[in-house]
Amino acid sequence: MKVGVALSGGVDSAVALYLLLKEGHEVKAFHMKTKEDEFFIKKEIKKKVCCSPSDTADAMRIAHFLGVEIEIVDVKEIFREKVIEPFKRDLLKGLTPNPCAHCNRFVKFGYLMDYVLNQGFDAFASGHYARIEFSEKYGRKVIKKGVDLKKDQSYFLARIEPWRIERLIFPNGIYTKEEIRKIAEEAGIHVAKKQESQDVCFIPDGSIENFLKDEGITLKDGDIITPEGEVVGRHFGYPLYTIGQRKGFKIEKFGRRYYVRGKIPEKNVVVVSDLEDVFFSGLIAEDPVWHVEVPEEFRCVCRVRKKSEEAPAVVKVKDNEVEVSFEKKVFAVTPGQIAAFYDGDTLLGGAIIKEGIR
């Protein structure tokens, strides 16, 4: 089989490439360039991020070592259009966007995958910790969680188009991270011990404030208020805060522990409250993408953030919205994040959280 592999320059995609070669596939590597090299050179990189010049160098070295052709694909324009600009808009709307999920849908498993398939490849592969398997229950191939639940990345794949699943391969999904590193080490791949990417690739210094400043937006301090309207402190720019956060702002009224309850962008206000007020009985989400056919109402488990606990829930689907009712209240349901829906370890799809229901 002819397989195009997204090669980031990290150990996961390197091992995915290696495993496919071992299986006898005809393989070519594709490496995305999301930003100009100068962008990373000018920034202080506090955490390991993907798509930097060093990643490009590593990807080329991996491909050369494994004896495969590599092509550098310029995705800067589509990346700005589909990831950076929406991220910026959503921050200013008071949302907490998920750029990695948008990148997966529109860039990696959108533009890049189309680019690969249009070259005549049979399938597209990456180093994601997830599995592609045929489901007897749903009568089609589905995405399942990776066996290493600590590294499972299925959440970030919740909104990719369902037809693409038939053409995807995730070789790493049946391994743990430790096993992947061991395979790389035994194969002599030089990135076997390379640090994992930790942050948003286009914010290498980890500062949303600096990102917005680079985009021509200066944040303004504002009031922190209670739901009753009492001013209890000051914030440093509402886009810096997310639901459930309890640090990073200046509280002038002591004696209580405050958590971010919400934001009012048009008034430049952050609303805080007690811990119990940031637990939610449900949510409304919009623009759902379903990988399988689902009824108008069904039971499943829902994940509202990558590291959140899965919550048993009843889901009601109506037109372009989804109403989710949890069995037990869930912490910090955050507008802009992805609600991913599972049947056991099978990913059913995902939607963008519009609002939490208390």
UniProtKB/Swiss-Prot annotation:
Its taxonomic path starts at: Bacteria, Thermotogati, Thermotogota, Thermotogae, Thermotogales
Q: What is its EC number?
A: 2.8.1.13
Q: What is the species of this protein?
A: Thermotoga maritima (strain ATCC 43589 / DSM 3109 / JCM 10099 / NBRC 100826 / MSB8)
Region feature Interaction with tRNA, mapped onto this chain = 151-153
**Record-listed ATP binding positions:** 6-13, 32, 127
User: GO CC terms on record?
Assistant: cytoplasm
Spell out the Gene3D superfamilies in the cross-references: Adenine nucleotide alpha hydrolases-like domains, HUPs, Translation factors
The record describes the protein's role as:
Catalyzes the 2-thiolation of uridine at the wobble position (U34) of tRNA, leading to the formation of s(2)U34.
Instruction: State where it is primarily located.
Output: cytoplasm
Which family is this sequence assigned to?
Answer: Belongs to the MnmA/TRMU family.
Q: Which keywords describe this protein according to UniProt?
A: ATP-binding, Cytoplasm, Disulfide bond, Nucleotide-binding, RNA-binding, Transferase, tRNA processing, tRNA-binding
Q: By what name is this protein known?
A: tRNA-specific 2-thiouridylase MnmA
Tell me the disulfide pairings in this chain.
Answer: 103-201
List the residues marked with site Interaction with tRNA.
128, 337
Query: Where along the chain is the active site annotated?
Result: 103 (nucleophile), 201 (cysteine persulfide intermediate)
